[in-house]
Amino acid sequence: MNDGVSTPVWLHIGPLEIHETVVTTWLIMLVLVVASILLTRRLSLQPGRLQAMLEGVVLTLESAIANADSRNARRLLPLIGTFWIFLPVANLLGVIPGMHSPTRDLSVTAALALVVFFAVHAYGVRQSGLGYFKHYLSPSPILLPFHIISEFTRTVALAIRLFGNIMSLEMAALLILLVAGFLAPVPILMLHIIEALVQAYIFGMLALIYVAGAMQQTTESPITSSSRSTSGAP
């Protein structure tokens, strides 16, 4: 774990500084990509133990997504599944001595939140076409500024929530180690693992809720719908 808030600079390329956060983030992605290729290159119709375990992981992720949106579980699996695989690894990197989680850097969590922000609208447009944006004018166009503010504030909250929790977790662990010395490593390690997994799950679940909500938006306003039901129109 690192005892500082800022991440150290590992490399200078002219005026450009490459921070440890960038290196560790790309390293995690490289490891996950290579592991995915190696683990899936020999898939069989008669799975062995390893393939059965991997299929169980995928089915578990798909089932969790289906609980929120059963109709679009397959379509959402690549995005949400990636979050639920990348984030636990990133959050748990701080357990390794001399390393710290890239998610304790606000720039990383902000980038992840922006991915969610753009994914919400991409999936919404893919589902409903450009008519998806009409829901920002519902129930009245005067509420458009409030809808826009809501979109940005929840994106900021998504970034700050993950950053704040991982940062506070590592700082609290450091303070406990300074006070209790070597009497506390095992409880701290367990706390770190549990909290890292919980925060990864929460981030992925919030992303799932936002994207699924966008895909379920209809182009018909509530006012039109209620007037039709009142008048008895089909």
From Swiss-Prot:
Residues spanning the membrane: 20-40, 76-96, 105-125, 162-184, 195-215
Principal cellular location given in the protein's record: membrane
UniProt GO MF annotations: proton-transporting ATP synthase activity, rotational mechanism
Coiled-coil segments on the chain, per record: none
Gene3D superfamilies in the record: ATP synthase, F0 complex, subunit A
Keyword terms, alphabetized: ATP synthesis, Cell inner membrane, Cell membrane, CF(0), Hydrogen ion transport, Ion transport, Membrane, Transmembrane, Transmembrane helix, Transport
GO biological process: proton motive force-driven plasma membrane ATP synthesis
InterPro entries documented for this protein: ATP_syn_F0_a_bact/chloroplast (IPR045082), ATP_synth_F0_asu (IPR000568), ATP_synth_F0_asu_AS (IPR023011), F0_ATP_A_sf (IPR035908)
Membrane topology: Multi-pass membrane protein
Location(s), subcellular: Cell inner membrane
Any single Gene Ontology cellular-component annotation: plasma membrane
HAMAP family hit by this protein: ATP_synth_a_bact
Self-association and partners: F-type ATPases have 2 components, CF(1) - the catalytic core - and CF(0) - the membrane proton channel. CF(1) has five subunits: alpha(3), beta(3), gamma(1), delta(1), epsilon(1). CF(0) has three main subunits: a(1), b(2) and c(9-12). The alpha and beta chains form an alternating ring which encloses part of the gamma chain. CF(1) is attached to CF(0) by a central stalk formed by the gamma and epsilon chains, while a peripheral stalk is formed by the delta and b chains.
Similarity field: Belongs to the ATPase A chain family.
Free-text function comment from the UniProt entry: Key component of the proton channel; it plays a direct role in the translocation of protons across the membrane.
PANTHER family for the chain: ATP SYNTHASE SUBUNIT A, CHLOROPLASTIC
Name of the molecule in the record: ATP synthase subunit a 1
Organism: Hahella chejuensis (strain KCTC 2396)
